[in-house]
C-alpha cells in the first residue's frame, strides 16, 4: 500500500501571498497543487520549489464555474488535502458607485463563491482522514467598514463569519479553519490597486508588512484554535477599534 502524500492546494498561487504560502508550505508537504491564471508564473514556482516538494501547476480562472470545477476535480484526483489555502482575489479602489457592477459581482464570485465551493469539496476528504487545515485569506478591511472599498470589505467580512462558523461546525473532526486578516502587504496586490488610484505613500511605513511575515504568522497560528488571525500588533489594534465602532452603532 503506497504511503499517502501530504498535499496542499493554494489558489492565487502565482504571486504575492499565494506564492509565499507555496514556499513556506513546501517543507511541510510532499505535493502542492498551485492554482492561478498565469501559467508562466506557475512554471517558475515549479522550478523554484523542485527540491522541496512536487508542485502541480493548475491553470484556472476561479471567477468562472469551469475554473472552480477544475479545482474540485484536482481535489478528487490528488486525494485528501492537508492544507487548503483560499487566497485568490483582487482589489478595487474607489466608492461602490464608481465601480462597474460586473467587477463587483466578479469579486463576490471569486472571494466568496470559489472559497465556499472549494471548502465544500475538501472537507469530506479531510474529515475522512481525521483532520486538515483551511486558511481563508480575508483582510483587515473586514473589520473596518467605510475605510475601504465597500464590496471588497464585505466579501472579507463574509469570510470571517464563514470561517468562525465553520470552525464551530467542525469541532471534533480535527479540521482547523482560519481566516487570515492581513493589512497592507508589499505585493503586486497593492501595486495593482495603485494603478487604479490608490496612493501607497499615504500609508505609514510601520503599517506595511512583507508577504513572508504574514504567511509565517498564519502558519504559526495553526494548532492554536484561533479562527481569526490578524498579523501585526498595530493591525490587531485597528481590528479591535473597528469592532468596537460596530458595537457602538447598536446603541
Describe the residue ranges of each PLM region.
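Substrate-binding pocket helix/loop in short-chain dehydrogenase/reductase
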Residues: 95-97, 103-108
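Conserved NAD(P)H cofactor-binding loop of Rossmann-fold oxidoreductase domains
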Residues: 87-92
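Conserved glycine-rich Rossmann-like NAD(P)H-binding loop of the short-chain dehydrogenase/reductase
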Residues: 29-44
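Residue(s) in the substrate-gating loop at a strand-loop-helix junction
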Residues: 139
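Conserved glycine-rich cofactor-binding loop
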Residues: 14-15
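C-terminal helical subdomain
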Residues: 179, 199-238
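Active-site helix of classical SDR
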Residues: 119, 155
Amino acid at each position: 500500500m503506497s504511503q499517502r502524500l501530504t498535499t496542499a492546494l493554494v489558489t492565487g498561487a502565482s504571486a504575492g501571498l499565494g506564492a509565499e504560502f507555496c514556499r513556506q508550505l513546501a517543507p511541510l508537504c510532499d505535493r502542492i497543487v498551485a492554482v492561478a491564471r498565469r501559467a508562466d508564473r506557475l512554471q517558475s514556482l515549479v522550478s523554484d520549489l523542485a527540491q522541496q516538494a512536487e508542485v502541480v501547476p493548475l491553470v484556472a480562472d476561479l471567477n468562472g464555474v469551469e475554473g472552480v470545477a477544475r479545482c474540485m476535480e484536482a481535489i478528487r484526483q490528488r486525494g485528501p488535502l492537508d492544507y487548503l489555502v483560499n487566497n485568490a482575489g483582487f482589489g478595487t479602489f474607489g466608492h461602490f458607485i464608481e465601480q462597474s457592477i460586473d467587477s463587483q459581482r466578479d469579486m463576490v464570485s471569486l472571494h466568496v463563491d470559489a472559497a465556499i465551493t472549494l471548502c465544500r469539496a475538501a472537507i469530506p476528504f479531510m474529515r475522512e482522514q481525521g483532520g486538515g487545515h483551511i486558511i481563508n485569506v480575508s483582510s483587515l478591511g473586514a473589520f473596518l467598514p467605510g475605510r475601504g472599498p465597500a464590496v471588497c470589505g464585505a466579501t472579507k467580512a463574509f469570510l470571517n463569519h464563514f470561517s468562525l462558523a465553520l470552525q464551530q461546525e467542525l469541532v471534533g473532526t480535527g479540521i482547523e479553519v482560519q481566516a487570515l486578516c492581513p493589512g497592507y502587504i508589499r505585493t503586486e496586490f497593492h501595486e495593482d490597486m495603485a494603478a487604479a488610484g490608490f496612493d501607497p505613500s499615504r500609508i505609514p511605513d510601520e503599517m506595511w508588512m512583507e508577504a513572508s511575515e504574514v504567511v509565517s504568522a498564519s502558519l504559526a497560528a495553526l494548532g492554536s484554535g484561533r479562527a481569526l488571525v490578524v498579523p501585526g500588533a498595530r493591525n490587531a489594534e485597528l481590528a479591535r477599534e473597528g469592532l468596537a465602532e460596530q458595537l457602538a452603532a447598536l446603541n
